[in-house]
Structure formats: structure tokens, C-alpha cells
Regions:
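Non-catalytic cap/lid and distal C-terminal segments of serine-dependent acyl enzymes
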Residues: 1-35, 41-349
Length: 349
């Protein structure tokens, strides 16, 4: 049976197919309140766990099923609703009122995907796959959106489906989406000066040599990719006119002790502090940010939005009732990314 919302709590149930189960533990984000260990249900058999209803639209979870010293991590066999994530499949329970974005089922312009590589200062070339509306020729001028973690953003957050649907609906002009591949993700997406300079200079030069780019570029990303999008925007302005950062990893010593073991935490926190300390923007950006109100990055995203606004950037931070995952990022693309794209591309873009 899928998880049930029963008034002020959610009930999870696990009915094993064998008698050897000795314990069941709920695996989910710590933003979900309550305990994690199931109890035996003497009345109905199996195992049951009640947790307070979280202030979330969706909960992604798995079960850790114990058989003595052996532990098997599984999706909920009683729940047919699952989601692909960057870390494997998860079961999902959706709260009343949740709905996927309208554009997922809407008509969309077809597109084509063309692979490229960008060369510069990085030790490895940067692979980039460019999505283009099928009826848009390479020499036709069109705006450009560059997305970090591009393949995952497309597979798990449907970013090119979003673009195709928004173009078909007339909400966005025909545009191209450059999906950047994270070959050495932690190194590149932690403020690597070589990576940032590669994309800001030779990378954008290469894309503009291949395609007719109209106006200012918008760069996007999530988590470490959100940090990278912001740093790239600050470096490459005014060539880059807009930034869209989702759940950006704007690590600070005072907020993010849990991340202090990250290999590049020192570099990230120093770069973040330098942005927080800025008082004036020579080239103001349009910055859209989204973050789960209950996720670990919420405090550092609020600080970053405040600092960017103080420096003169045009900033909108939208907090959502979800967490650090691609479905949350997908669900916030419209209107949050749409607003950034329209404002950059309609005014000098």
C-alpha cells in the first residue's frame, strides 16, 4: 500500500514477502520530521511507521530492510510511483494539491541535438550538446541558454522539453540550449578559475562561431552547478546577462559545517564570501534563484540573494515546498527560469 496521508501524519507501510525481516528503516531527507524505524503491526501484520506531515509537496524515500546483519535498500513495493534521481530510483508520495508542471504534457516544438567540444584552459575538453528547434538553422540568430550538468538536467528535469513547450506556447522565443557535460564535476564546479575562464572566453567564442547567437547569454545550474552559473555570470558579464541558480551550493563556514569535508569546501567558501562582500556591481545581472525552504542550502541561498541585491543585481529568490532534487528543480523552471529568460532576452537580449 502506498504511503497514506492521515490527517496530521503520513503512514508508511511495508509488508514483506518473507518472514525473515527483522527491521525496516525509512530513508528520506532529514527535513521530514519524526522517527525512521518501523514497528511491527500486530493487528495487520507487516511493518508500519507514522511521521508528522512534512511541509513539503512531495517526499522521496526508500526502505532499508534488515534481515539480521544484512540490509537491502529498496523502493516501496506497495507504491507504484517512483522517480529517477542522480542517485538511483526513489519512491514518491505526493501531498494533496501537488501537480507536475503544465508544460510536461503540452505540445512542444521538435528539436535536434548536436555534440561539440569546447577547448580552453581545462585539462580536459568540455563536451557540450546543443539543443536547437528543428526549424531553426545554425545561421538564424537566436538567444542561448547554457546549462551546467546539462545531460542530467535534460534527463531528470526535462529542460529541453521545457524549452520546446514554452517556445510552442509562445511564452519564449525560439532559442538554443547548450547542455554542458561535467567531466570533472567537483573540480570544475567548485570555482575552478580554469573552467570559468574556458567557458567565459573560448567556450562562448566557440559556440558563437558555430551558431548565430542573438543578445546576451543566460547561464543556469543547480547545486554546485548553481554556484558555477553565478560565478560564470559575474565573470562574463555583460556577455552573460542572466543567471538561474537552483539550490546553489553557496557554502559558508557559519552555515555549512556538514559540507566542510568536501574536497573543495575551502575554495568554495572563500569565493562565496568574496561575492557576499561585494557592494557594487559594474555589470548588473538578472538573477533568478530557487531553493527548497527546508533544504540545507536555504540559509546560504537567502544570504546570497540579499548580497546580490545589495550590490545592485536584479534578484528574485523563490522558495519552494520541495528539497534538493531534480524534480523540485524541474517543477520550478516555469515561471522562475521563464521570467529570467524573458527579461534578459526581451531587453537587450
Amino acid at each position: 500500500m502506498p504511503a497514506q496521508l492521515l490527517g496530521d501524519h503520513v503512514r508508511f507501510r511495508f509488508t514483506p514477502a518473507d518472514a525473515g525481516v527483522t527491521g525496516v528503516v525509512l530513508q528520506c531527507d532529514r527535513a521530514v520530521p519524526g522517527g525512521r524505524e518501523f514497528r511491527r503491526d500486530a493487528d495487520r501484520g507487516g511493518w508500519v511507521l507514522d511521521v508528522p506531515r512534512p511541509a513539503l509537496q512531495r517526499v522521496e524515500y526508500r526502505f532499508a530492510v534488515e534481515r539480521g546483519d544484512d540490509i537491502e535498500v529498496v523502493t516501496d513495493p506497495g507504491n507504484p510511483v517512483t522517480v529517477r534521481t542522480a542517485f538511483g530510483d526513489r519512491s514518491v508520495t505526493e501531498m494533496p494539491g501537488y501537480a507536475p508542471p503544465w508544460w510536461l504534457g503540452a505540445p512542444a516544438v521538435p528539436g535536434r541535438l548536436d555534440p561539440h567540444t569546447l577547448s580552453g584552459e581545462t585539462t580536459h575538453e568540455v563536451p557540450v550538446t546543443v539543443w536547437t528547434p528543428a526549424d531553426l538553422a545554425d545561421e538564424d540568430p537566436a538567444p542561448l541558454l547554457l546549462v551546467h550538468d546539462g545531460p542530467e538536467y535534460d534527463q531528470l528535469a526535462a529542460v529541453t522539453a521545457y524549452s520546446g513547450a514554452l517556445v510552442a506556447a509562445g511564452h519564449l522565443p525560439p532559442h538554443r540550449v547548450a547542455l554542458a557535460h561535467p567531466v570533472i564535476r567537483d573540480a570544475w564546479y567548485s570555482g575552478s578559475p580554469q573552467y570559468l575562464r574556458t567557458i567565459a572566453a573560448a567556450g562562448l567564442d566557440g559556440l558563437e562561431a558555430r551558431y548565430a547567437v542573438r543578445g546576451r547569454v543566460v547561464v543556469a545550474g543547480a547545486s554546485l552547478g548553481g554556484l558555477t552559473a553565478l560565478l560564470l555570470g559575474l565573470l562574463a558579464a555583460p556577455r552573460v546577462g542572466g543567471v538561474f541558480a537552483q539550490s546553489g551550493s553557496f557554502f559558508q563556514v557559519r552555515h555549512d559545517d556538514a559540507e566542510s569535508g568536501h574536497r573543495y569546501f575551502g575554495r568554495i567558501s572563500r569565493l562565496v564570501q568574496s561575492v557576499l562582500d561585494m557592494r557594487h556591481a559594474e555589470q548588473p545581472l538578472v538573477v533568478g534563484m530557487t531553493c527548497g525552504a527546508l533544504e540545507d542550502n536555504a540559509a546560504n541561498n537567502r544570504d546570497m540573494a540579499t548580497a546580490l541585491h545589495r550590490a545592485g543585481h536584479d534578484v528574485t529568490l523563490t522558495e519552494v515546498a520541495d528539497l534538493h532534487n531534480y524534480t523540485a528543480w524541474r517543477d520550478a523552471l516555469d515561471p522562475c527560469l521563464t521570467d529570467v529568460l524573458r527579461r534578459v532576452w526581451d531587453h537587450g537580449g
